[in-house]
Amino acid sequence: MPAIVLLGAQWGDEGKGKATDLLAERIDYCVRFNGGNNAGHTIVIDGETYAMHLLPSGVLTPGVVPVIGNGVVIDLGVLFDEIDLLTARGIDTSRLVVSANAHVITAYHRVIDKVTERFLGKARIGTTGRGIGPAYADKMSRVGVRVQDLFDEKILRQKIEGALDQKNQLLVKVYNRRAIDPTAVADELLGYADRLRPMVADTAALLNDALDHHKTVLLEAGQGTLLDVDHGTYPFVTSSNATAGGACTGSGIGPTRIDRVIAVAKAYTTRVGSGPFPTELHDGEGEKLRRIGAEFGVTTGRPRRCGWYDAVAVRYAMRINGVTDVVLTKLDVLSHFERIPVCVAYRLPDGRTVEEMPMTQTELHHVEPVYEELPGWQEDLSAARSLEDLPKNAQRYVEFLQELAGVPFSVIGVGPGRDQTIQLKALV
């Protein structure tokens, strides 16, 4: 059986958790391959809401093996808090497998993330302050702490002492903060070792062996394409690859083993943190989208910036990821609008109109959206289970977005519940 990639086509928060849940009964393994607890996903099952940050969505489905891949950076305190919360609600988390090569977020990563963001002032990126960026920076600088290091105390202490030799100089002399005690950091991590050990494995070998035995593996991205460190709106991005290429490097599964790439897109657009957002609404309609769509971050609780659907950005995500199927979510939120503009192009400062993402950051920051306006429907969609059940104007809206994306829409979300979906085509 194949590997399937599921990712976001916008700036994250597209509803990937619900899409994973729809697939869960047809998959055997569910893998997080990037990011850390800066990403959040919410799933509603039988009226129960589950909000998670590190654990793969598949943990909620009996029989599915949830895997945290080597591309993830793990805050072990957050991981075990999530496990304990789910266990208290009757969810079996004993199947969880964690890559020995995943990197670990330490206390000094969190401190550096917060003080750096404050130091930047108005130029700040808008990070969650959870140490994600500094942990990835250490990974690339080859001074990071990996999960496997927790089982070799000597190596762990050497790595932490070496890292803090430099970081404490920065904290004390530049940021006017106190130095961090390497012994305390190491002791904290070693305190997790015994509980963590039974979960740890060579996940690349595990997943490739599963594919060899005709199992289905779902590779689940955190964040979204436009937050990808290489292909997103840099520098206002996350620190990992949230695109299809990241699924390979973050899991150890080769590209020829991937059969489908499913992108999730909201029927409008949201963004958290700083950075360009061409269709952002600064008026009552933006606030209305935020209120009706409950657009507040799962991880931070911050209100999300809201705007109309950006077909230019979504089409870019289709190309970057080689998308085969689209899941459109939150169509029901738009039921409260008489008219619904869709961004079909950008107008550059020099007056040119383009239908592709501008090459430079400067151009993107100064584009104006070119809208085509469609009539709304103002009817409840939550009971719709086929395209024909939708009002004509809602059908027209979906068909227009599909035409602009150039990729078939396989699922349409018409509410937060697992059953509030229209399945146009099987995803697996």
Swiss-Prot record:
<dbReference type="GO" id="GO:0005525">
    <property type="term" value="F:GTP binding"/>
</dbReference>
<feature type="binding site">
    <location>
        <position position="13"/>
    </location>
    <ligand>
        <name>Mg(2+)</name>
    </ligand>
</feature>
<keyword id="KW-0436">Ligase</keyword>
<feature type="active site" description="Proton donor">
    <location>
        <position position="41"/>
    </location>
</feature>
<dbReference type="Pfam" id="PF00709">
    <property type="entry name" value="Adenylsucc_synt"/>
</dbReference>
<feature type="binding site" description="in other chain">
    <location>
        <begin position="13"/>
        <end position="16"/>
    </location>
    <ligand>
        <name>IMP</name>
    </ligand>
</feature>
<feature type="binding site">
    <location>
        <begin position="330"/>
        <end position="332"/>
    </location>
    <ligand>
        <name>GTP</name>
    </ligand>
</feature>
<dbReference type="InterPro" id="IPR001114">
    <property type="entry name" value="Adenylosuccinate_synthetase"/>
</dbReference>
<dbReference type="InterPro" id="IPR042111">
    <property type="entry name" value="Adenylosuccinate_synth_dom3"/>
</dbReference>
<keyword id="KW-0460">Magnesium</keyword>
<feature type="binding site" description="in other chain">
    <location>
        <position position="128"/>
    </location>
    <ligand>
        <name>IMP</name>
    </ligand>
</feature>
<comment type="function">
    <text>Plays an important role in the de novo pathway of purine nucleotide biosynthesis. Catalyzes the first committed step in the biosynthesis of AMP from IMP.</text>
</comment>
<feature type="binding site">
    <location>
        <position position="304"/>
    </location>
    <ligand>
        <name>GTP</name>
    </ligand>
</feature>
<comment type="pathway">
    <text>Purine metabolism; AMP biosynthesis via de novo pathway; AMP from IMP: step 1/2.</text>
</comment>
<dbReference type="GO" id="GO:0000287">
    <property type="term" value="F:magnesium ion binding"/>
</dbReference>
<dbReference type="InterPro" id="IPR042110">
    <property type="entry name" value="Adenylosuccinate_synth_dom2"/>
</dbReference>
<dbReference type="InterPro" id="IPR042109">
    <property type="entry name" value="Adenylosuccinate_synth_dom1"/>
</dbReference>
<feature type="active site" description="Proton acceptor">
    <location>
        <position position="13"/>
    </location>
</feature>
<dbReference type="GO" id="GO:0004019">
    <property type="term" value="F:adenylosuccinate synthase activity"/>
</dbReference>
<keyword id="KW-0658">Purine biosynthesis</keyword>
<dbReference type="GO" id="GO:0005737">
    <property type="term" value="C:cytoplasm"/>
</dbReference>
<keyword id="KW-0547">Nucleotide-binding</keyword>
<dbReference type="GO" id="GO:0044208">
    <property type="term" value="P:'de novo' AMP biosynthetic process"/>
</dbReference>
<keyword id="KW-0963">Cytoplasm</keyword>
<keyword id="KW-0342">GTP-binding</keyword>
<dbReference type="InterPro" id="IPR033128">
    <property type="entry name" value="Adenylosuccin_syn_Lys_AS"/>
</dbReference>
<feature type="binding site" description="in other chain">
    <location>
        <position position="302"/>
    </location>
    <ligand>
        <name>IMP</name>
    </ligand>
</feature>
<protein>
    <recommendedName>
        <fullName>Adenylosuccinate synthetase</fullName>
        <ecNumber>6.3.4.4</ecNumber>
    </recommendedName>
</protein>
<comment type="similarity">
    <text>Belongs to the adenylosuccinate synthetase family.</text>
</comment>
<feature type="binding site">
    <location>
        <position position="40"/>
    </location>
    <ligand>
        <name>Mg(2+)</name>
    </ligand>
</feature>
<feature type="binding site" description="in other chain">
    <location>
        <position position="238"/>
    </location>
    <ligand>
        <name>IMP</name>
    </ligand>
</feature>
<dbReference type="GO" id="GO:0046040">
    <property type="term" value="P:IMP metabolic process"/>
</dbReference>
<dbReference type="InterPro" id="IPR018220">
    <property type="entry name" value="Adenylosuccin_syn_GTP-bd"/>
</dbReference>
<feature type="binding site" description="in other chain">
    <location>
        <position position="223"/>
    </location>
    <ligand>
        <name>IMP</name>
    </ligand>
</feature>
<feature type="binding site" description="in other chain">
    <location>
        <begin position="38"/>
        <end position="41"/>
    </location>
    <ligand>
        <name>IMP</name>
    </ligand>
</feature>
<feature type="binding site">
    <location>
        <begin position="298"/>
        <end position="304"/>
    </location>
    <ligand>
        <name>substrate</name>
    </ligand>
</feature>
<keyword id="KW-0479">Metal-binding</keyword>
<feature type="binding site">
    <location>
        <position position="142"/>
    </location>
    <ligand>
        <name>IMP</name>
    </ligand>
</feature>
<feature type="binding site">
    <location>
        <begin position="12"/>
        <end position="18"/>
    </location>
    <ligand>
        <name>GTP</name>
    </ligand>
</feature>
<feature type="binding site">
    <location>
        <begin position="413"/>
        <end position="415"/>
    </location>
    <ligand>
        <name>GTP</name>
    </ligand>
</feature>
<feature type="binding site">
    <location>
        <begin position="40"/>
        <end position="42"/>
    </location>
    <ligand>
        <name>GTP</name>
    </ligand>
</feature>
<dbReference type="InterPro" id="IPR027417">
    <property type="entry name" value="P-loop_NTPase"/>
</dbReference>
